[in-house]
Amino acid sequence: LLRIQGPIVECQLLETPLLNIINFQSLIATKSARIKCSAGDDPVIEFGLRRAQGPNGALGASRAAYVGGTEATSNVLAAKKYGIPVKGTHAHSWIMSFGSELEAFEKYALAMPNNCLFLVDTYDTIEGIKNAIQVGLQLKKKGHRLVGIRLDSGDLAYLSIEARKLLDGAGFTDALIIASNDLSEEIIDSLKHQGAKINIWGVGTKLVTAYEQPALGGVYKLGAIRDFEGIWEYRIKLSEQIIKVSNPGILQVRRFKNTEGLFIGDMIYNTAQPEDRKRQ
């Protein structure tokens, strides 16, 4: 991933911060890419701030998830700091703070008429969808549109199919269905296989914590050192565990692709051959 060259003391001081940054964010970016592969052309939004490993972990995770393929984040600070698009929905507490779900949707529509995407599972999801449609019809009369609904619990495949039927039947064929609730690439694959009618995936906990593999074992090892005469001498770390034996040399990575431009593999090679180990 990275090669550092410089005085040995200065290079050593960089080990801990580099590994801390690169290991965690590489892990999250990889997880994000896996999730995006499962989602296909559907947008993925990172929803993980509340479950992330502390404030700094949340910021790094939002950035890495965006690098890995998410379209936006619900983390407002990360959006501001890194220029990531910010998206999200209202909370269950908004619904619960009113006398009824319908009233909550109506008040939200008054405040945000051009951005009405309702969270419909606070009490009863099917009834929530019907209430969202009712408010959507009111919006349509005023020249606005119902952006969509969000499903956050229950059988997401069944509920999304029913939601699509209800929305289409009411004339909201362009309304979006967002799904969340501890999603992962495996769950997204399963939901798609079941024919779920989900347009956007909100992925949080299992993305920002890299749930199935919470740590990446990247290392930082000395590969070569230059003597007082300017000659490079290679160094190798030996171990009874093959995976912990380091590669000596001044290393670089070459990536190979096929004729269609698709990735085949990477080759790690030594840039300094024996005949040119002396560097100016």
Set out the residue ranges of the language-model regions.
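Short hydrophobic alpha-helical runs that function as membrane-insertion/retention elements
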Residues: 3, 87-88, 178, 199-202
